[in-house]
Amino acid sequence: MASNLLSRLLPSASDDLLEQEASNNQNRRTSSSTDERPDMDIDEENFGARFEAQDLNDLLAEASSSHMTTESRAASPEARRNAPPGINTAARAPAWRQPAPARAVPLDDDDDVPQSLLLEGGLDPPPNPHPRPDGLPPPVPGPSTRHTRAQWETTRQQQRLHGDDRGGAPVRDWGAIGRGGQFTADPKEKASWLWVNQTDLDTYMREVYEYYVGSGIYSMILRRTLSLLQSAFVVGFMTFLGWCIDYSKLSGSNKLSQVLVPKCTKEIHGFWIFALWVFTIYWLYSFYGLLTDIPRLRAMHDFYHYLLDVPDRDIQTIQWQQIVSRIMALRDLNLTTASNLSPETRKLLDSKSRQRLDAVDIASRLMRRDNYLIALFNKEILDVTVPIPFLGNRFIFSETTGWHVNLAVMEFVFSGPNGQFNQDFLKERNRRELVRRLRGRFFWTGIISIICAPFAVVFVLASYLFKYFTEYHKDPGQLSNRDFTTFAQWKFREFNELPHLFNRRRNMAYPYANLYLAQFPKDKTEQISSFVAFIAGAFASVLVAFTLLDSELFLTFEISPGKTAIFWIGVLTTIYRVARGSSPQEDQVTDPSYYLDHVIYHTRYKPDSWQDRLHTDEVRAEFAKLYQPKILIFAEEILSMVVTPFLLMFRLPQCSERIVDFFREFSIVVDGLGVTCSYSMFPFKKGTQNVNNAPANRSGAHKDDGDLREDYFMAKDNKMLASYYGFLDTYATTGKGNSARLPGRAGFHPPPQFPNAFGAMSQTAQPVDVGARGTSRGPAGRQPLQRRTPRSGPAGRDEPIASVLLDPHHQPSSASILRGSPRTGPSGRYRTPLQPVADTPGTRIEEESTIGDSWRTSRLAQDDDEEEEAPGANRGGVLQLLQQFSKAQAEGRGAGVGV
């Protein structure tokens, strides 16, 4: 009845445009008043009504003069059923019934209400001319909070109200809503609801990335299940081999039943029984965690399948950059990341700032912890050296050591709510207390390492033996295979570089690292190896020849007591293969600098001490410490299980003060992102000229106090710039569907040039940029040693391209030019590599860098470069003719070359 009275008093929908504008202004003022007063509620029936100020004032005056103290329609059961979720309609009066501040009229205490205005619960309300359509979800009862009100405001802005469906199309049936507001019918609606209400973006983005790396729900469940079964098999098989076999009876027995120990479980030592109980509890806990993670994985599967449109069958082939672009397209559907929320609605959210979620922000969230570890290694704050007799100090940082450091340091730093950064580290007054607590954590982590070391050593040894024994027995040459150590990989990693991208870059460096170490000739060793291979091959060839003549007789012929010919054939063949592998190859060209240049290009690691010394044996020795045989890496892993307690209890506590100071001085608070490492914020708008002129990149000049301070905050080995250019190379795209270098989509390019008499990489023969990295990154693993030949050498452009994966504040500015970039391509033998090229007056000299090609994503940019080269192109000569011929082929012209 109250709504009918207002409908007669207020203007109708057929008023003129001026009255509609005034009504809209009044509605905005009413909405703002509702937001500013959290104790008010909303009468849903009057959502679509329009009010004039004088009408409301007259109505309030009439109500006060008649001594009316009616209750809101929200108090009725029908209104409570029609209220939106999260809105408490029983405790407060509607917003339109609140007295105006300028004309507040005190209400009388008389409770007499006219009979016509009474709304009894048992009486039927008057029929609504516009009945509520069927199929709408029933309200979910719950307390009214700021978060639920913000959700309702967002939903009201993005979806039409119930009253707007009059005479329209039938409303879609949302399906039943289960207890707690969870959708039970439509998985797409459930995935949308979960994304809209997601507030912990760090955890959610981590789950999204783990799902992508894990290749989908079924692959992740299968991998974890097989891992549990493998660990159970290893422990059970070790128990059987250790306690259920009588090894003293092996020599005189020919059946397994004769050597088995009956009721062997009673013979197991108490210490091993304790270990079995601990392992059983851990295994059951892991299995329970797998079962409880299935609903979460199912929800992530729906998110990929319905919102990102990426089914599990495509998740192994789609690029991460496409996943990022599709997540960015969903930002306006989330409360915390939406850009279309009003300031009044934003005030009701827990986070007053809009959460940032572009490519840089997603990488910063995923790498929030790893960025700090990369910076700790870059600044050389963690002292993980162990003095070894006759060998000096050696770096010992294996996966076991990294796990304990993460437990002692990173779990302490990120001990805030929901695993966030602990704000105590940002305050200098907490320094002494934090140092004391960090030393205590190092000590107790060392105690835990001592307790777990015996079990870990036995388990890892058995697992490694069961996994690799067959491979090493079949091919002994695999014992010499090398890999980068864990310490080296942390030195190579870049800021905001996701693990799967780093693994791809590391894999590209493997073939060149092997060829580099094989470049250093050892003349004496090679001569001896050739002689041994000759002798072993001679004996083996004679034995094989006699075997072919009379195999039945000669195979049982004993050359030495108890050793037949077949035994000696196997021994001599093994000796020959090992000696032959150490002999030099006839077609090998010795040029260590060439191969190490390619290793540096992919690893992006080049200390200052290596400058102009890539051919020396000292550099080879330093590189060999980073690239060691796998068998030595495994031995170091076993040794670290014994050495790690020493590091945790004696070495690392001495670094506690520097660690605490590091987290305070290299942490910044970013609005919409939280606390993050300062190195993860790239200089998109500041440019790189000032960074290149920083003290860390200057030499030979006297450094004052200001320069020393800048040097302290500067990353070593140009790590910051390398990370910046690497990130742009990974995520740079124009949004046209093609990335910087998508394989199979580029135009025709001529074949690579042949090496000339000056060497394969001389100044006239352009370098072959192997495994050049584009946005698509190509297939994982080791890349072929070829790419298209540039027309005039790759050249960096002055203006960077814009990327659809970056927000406007992250777009590279014109100041962020590529000259001076540390990411230059492998240079020639007679050319100084990796040197920035300065501009000369009247001439633009571009550095020889493969990053330049990755920034050229349009054919127009390449044509502009060709036009710039045209005026000074006529230099004559055979090389010029070949260049013109290659250019004609690249442009697709079938005509001849003009001479």
Curated annotation (Swiss-Prot):
Residues 442-462, 630-650 dip into the membrane without crossing it. It is a multi-pass membrane protein. Residues 246-270, 549-552 are lumenal. Pfam families: ATG9. Keywords: Autophagy, Cytoplasmic vesicle, Endoplasmic reticulum, Golgi apparatus, Lipid transport, Membrane, Phosphoprotein, Transmembrane, Transmembrane helix, Transport. Residues 1-224, 292-441, 463-527, 574-629, 651-899 are cytoplasmic. It is found in: Preautophagosomal structure membrane; Cytoplasmic vesicle membrane; Golgi apparatus membrane; Endoplasmic reticulum membrane. It catalyses: a 1,2-diacyl-sn-glycero-3-phosphocholine(in) = a 1,2-diacyl-sn-glycero-3-phosphocholine(out); a 1,2-diacyl-sn-glycero-3-phospho-L-serine(in) = a 1,2-diacyl-sn-glycero-3-phospho-L-serine(out); a 1,2-diacyl-sn-glycero-3-phosphoethanolamine(in) = a 1,2-diacyl-sn-glycero-3-phosphoethanolamine(out); a 1,2-diacyl-sn-glycero-3-phospho-(1D-myo-inositol-3-phosphate)(in) = a 1,2-diacyl-sn-glycero-3-phospho-(1D-myo-inositol-3-phosphate)(out). Residues 1-173, 769-876 are annotated as: Disordered. Residues 23-33, 90-104 have a biased composition (Low complexity). Residues 63-73, 151-160, 851-860 have a biased composition (Polar residues). One of its GO terms (biological process) is mitophagy. InterPro entries: Autophagy-rel_prot_9. One of its GO terms (cellular component) is cytoplasmic vesicle membrane. The chain crosses the membrane at residues 225-245, 271-291, 528-548, 553-573. Residues 124-142 have a biased composition (Pro residues). Phosphorylated by ATG1. ATG1 phosphorylation is required for preautophagosome elongation. Forms a homotrimer with a solvated central pore, which is connected laterally to the cytosol through the cavity within each protomer. Acts as a lipid scramblase that uses its central pore to function: the central pore opens laterally to accommodate lipid headgroups, thereby enabling lipid flipping and redistribution of lipids added to the outer leaflet of ATG9-containing vesicles, thereby enabling growth into autophagosomes. Belongs to the ATG9 family. Homotrimer; forms a homotrimer with a central pore that forms a path between the two membrane leaflets. Phospholipid scramblase involved in autophagy and cytoplasm to vacuole transport (Cvt) vesicle formation. Cycles between the preautophagosomal structure/phagophore assembly site (PAS) and the cytoplasmic vesicle pool and supplies membrane for the growing autophagosome. Lipid scramblase activity plays a key role in preautophagosomal structure/phagophore assembly by distributing the phospholipids that arrive through ATG2 from the cytoplasmic to the luminal leaflet of the bilayer, thereby driving autophagosomal membrane expansion. Required for mitophagy. This is Autophagy-related protein 9. It comes from Phaeosphaeria nodorum (strain SN15 / ATCC MYA-4574 / FGSC 10173).
